[in-house]
């Protein structure tokens, strides 16, 4: 989108409605038909980014499979989503700084990750930690690897990725 491209090029602090309109090839006034101001536009954008991430976790998810297989699917979904969407990967830190982004993330209840954690904890498989901490110890490794792989020449063969998936899974087990 125009917002993603502008953010990647200039950073979220340098965005203006005029620059976004130019990037989108529309008149500046047109944007104001949809958004009162830059903050509202960025908040809606933050909702969109988070919704895309939630949809990524859901892709090909099958809760009838063993918990590790469910976890592997979510990890791979994140990995491949970030490989296919390098602009999102480039903008991750900026997304986190968007107005209300943290609140948007916290206010989403019953998301796939939370449900997975509750069910796996109930089954006695996962450590009794918050969903946020479990995420940082596990699925966040996919995000960190994808981000660092852009700058460091990792040899990320499928067997290495599988090893990372298994090790990050063990990190959150009881």
Predicted segments with their positions:
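Helix-turn-helix
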Residues: 2, 6-40, 44
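Hydrophobic alpha-helical connector segments
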Residues: 44, 48, 58-84, 135-138, ...
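Amphipathic alpha-helical packing segments from all-alpha helical-bundle domains
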Residues: 51, 77, 98-123, 128, ...
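Solvent-exposed, amphipathic alpha-helical segments
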Residues: 2-9, 52-60, 137-148
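Hydrophobic/aromatic residues within well-ordered alpha-helical segments
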Residues: 38, 45, 49, 53, ...
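Short coil/turn segments at alpha/beta junctions that flank glycine-rich nucleotide-binding fingerprints
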Residues: 9-13, 85, 123
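C-terminal alpha-helix
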Residues: 116, 167-174
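Amphipathic alpha-helical segments used for helix-helix packing
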Residues: 76-100, 144-151
